[in-house]
Each structure stands twice: as C-alpha cells, then as structure tokens.
C-alpha cells in the first residue's frame, strides 16, 4: 500500500491525461494499477484492506474507466465505519458514474461520523477540510437529484463549518 502510494505521489492529481484518456507518461499509474489489481486478484484479504481500497479509488477516479472502482468503493464505505473520510471515499467514483443517490446518502453518513469526531477533537483541526468536503459532496449529490431540501440542509451545515473570515475573504 505504501509503495503504491509512493508511485502515485510521483505525479499527484496528474496520474492520467484526462483529455486523452491515457496515463501520464511521467507518472506510474499503470504500475500502480497493475500492483493493486494483482493484489485484489491474488489476495482475498486485500478486499478488507482500507488502504489498498482507498488508493485504488484515487488511482481510478480520473482514469478513463472510473467504474472499475465501484466495487472497491462499495466495500470501503462499510469497512471502517468510524472514519468519515473512508465512508465518503466511494463517492469520488459514484459521482463520476452518476450514482447521485449514493453521493448524497454516503456523504450524509460521513457527515454524521464527522460530527462524532468533531465532538471528540473539536472543530479547529486538519479534519475541518474533510468535513467541508463531505458536506460539499452531499450538496452536489442532492442538487443533481433535484432534492432542494437536502441541498439546502447540506449548504446550511457547510456554512456553519466555514469561518466568517474565510467566507468574507473569498
């Protein structure tokens, strides 16, 4: 898992040439994909490894075939139920494949998990950006579903997470 993450970090957020649908020639997307897909094929326990599932989702989300990671996201959503970020991760693929119901429901679930962490650790820490990210995804999914109430609720919660100084600055 750490080796694959290192390969992916050679060209962070540029693993694929999105417009051409090919791997970035300066990166290691194909090598990372081969390693991860081999792990899932050869080692059944890989399907219970949150790190491997997480890396595969990030690897495939800007690839020409994000749908290859749908199963990985479905499994990861329930694997670590007290980690809001991992509950949310499947929606990086769901949104690309048009599954807005899962985008909304999984991010609302992630937001509930995030609330538990916020109660424990407070609001002002590195995880604040993850809470905002999950609520933004929930709002996006709700809008694509035409669920005005859910979208407004998500944006209301989102606004409470973003300090006034940030809102006024941007």
Model-derived features with residue positions:
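Acidic, glycine-rich loop-and-beta core segments that form the ion-binding/anion-interacting portion
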Residues: 103-117
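TPR-repeat structural position
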Residues: 29, 65-66, 100, 148
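Beta-sheet-rich non-transmembrane sensory/scaffold domains
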Residues: 109, 153-157
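A conserved active-site cap/scaffold subdomain adjacent to cofactor or substrate pockets
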Residues: 137, 143-151
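Active-site-adjacent "gating/activation" loops or surface patches in catalytic cores
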Residues: 48-50
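Short coil/linker segments at helix-helix boundaries
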Residues: 2-44, 53-63, 72-75, 80-82, ...
């Amino acid at each position: 898992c750490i080796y694959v993450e290192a390969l992916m970090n050679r060209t962070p957020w540029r693993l694929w040439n999105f417009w051409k649908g090919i791997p970035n020639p300066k990166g290691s997307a194909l090598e990372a994909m081969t390693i991860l897909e081999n792990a899932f094929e050869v080692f059944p326990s890989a399907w219970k490894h949150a790190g491997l599932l997480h890396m595969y989702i990030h690897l495939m989300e800007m690839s020409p075939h994000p749908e290859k990671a749908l199963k990985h996201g479905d499994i990861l959503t329930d694997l670590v139920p007290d980690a809001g970020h991992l509950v949310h991760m499947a929606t990086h693929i769901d949104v690309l494949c048009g599954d807005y119901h899962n985008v909304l429901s999984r991010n609302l679930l992630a937001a509930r998990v995030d609330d538990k962490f916020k109660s424990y650790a407070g609001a002002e820490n590195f995880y604040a950006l993850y809470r905002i990210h999950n609520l933004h995804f929930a709002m996006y999914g709700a809008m694509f579903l035409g669920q005005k109430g859910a979208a407004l609720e998500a944006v209301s919660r989102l606004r409470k997470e973003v300090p006034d100084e940030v809102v006024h600055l941007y």
